[in-house]
């Protein structure tokens, strides 16, 4: 489904936005479909990447917090949202580093993208009596999760949200100033990003 057609800086070439955030290009008669990036060589800018970033920007306050659980440390004044998969090795390393960060509220979005086992583990964590404890026990202390049953539609919604906003890897971090960081950050980087986000 074509959502939008708009001009590009190249005469006769138009941008097609398809299925929400997919970008393609075409000629004025729509005889040709071009897949790839438009690079502004003089300006040293990837215009396609900039456009996708703009389309997939997520305002922190617009995150679907009802589909996350919270972990509060210290006064919880600073805020961080994280999309993670329980089978992601980088997420486990990130979680260990995150233990060193205090005075923060962490909104944890379970985002099982690494297979069926990730889905089962995410369901077990989501359905646990104490989600935060079950998550940290598994991710930091390697304590197996106990299977449990409950409404797990939040996991489906997290998957839909992630696809819509191109969350393609875990962990993906969101800060209160709308900064998005793909990949694991260490405690020092997290502290810097939280400090910057809190200034705003």
Spans of model-derived segments:
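Extracytoplasmic thiol/disulfide redox context detector
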Residues: 1-123, 137-140, 144-170, 187-200
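Short secondary-structure capping/turn micro-motifs that flank functional sites
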Residues: 115, 178-179
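Conserved, helical-rich catalytic subdomain that frames metal- and/or nucleotide-binding sites
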Residues: 129-132, 136
């Amino acid at each position: 489904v074509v959502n939008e057609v708009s001009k590009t800086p190249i005469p006769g070439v138009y941008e097609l936005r398809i299925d929400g955030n997919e970008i393609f290009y075409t000629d004025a008669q729509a005889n040709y479909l071009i897949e790839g990036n438009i690079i502004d060589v003089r300006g040293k800018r990837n215009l396609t990447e900039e456009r996708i970033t703009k389309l997939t920007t997520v305002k922190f306050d617009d995150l679907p917090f009802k589909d996350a659980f919270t972990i509060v440390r210290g006064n919880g004044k600073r805020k961080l949202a994280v999309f993670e998969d329980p089978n992601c090795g980088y997420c486990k390393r990130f979680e260990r580093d995150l233990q060193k960060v205090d005075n923060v509220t962490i909104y944890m979005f379970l985002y099982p993208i690494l297979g069926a086992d990730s889905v089962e583990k995410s369901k077990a964590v989501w359905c646990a009596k104490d989600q935060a404890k079950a998550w940290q026990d598994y991710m930091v202390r390697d304590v197996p999760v106990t299977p449990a049953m409950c409404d797990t539609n939040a996991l489906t919604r997290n998957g839909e949200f992630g696809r819509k906003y191109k969350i393609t890897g875990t962990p993906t971090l969101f800060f209160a100033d709308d900064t998005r960081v793909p990949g694991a950050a260490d405690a020092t980087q997290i502290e810097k990003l939280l400090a910057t986000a809190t200034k705003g």
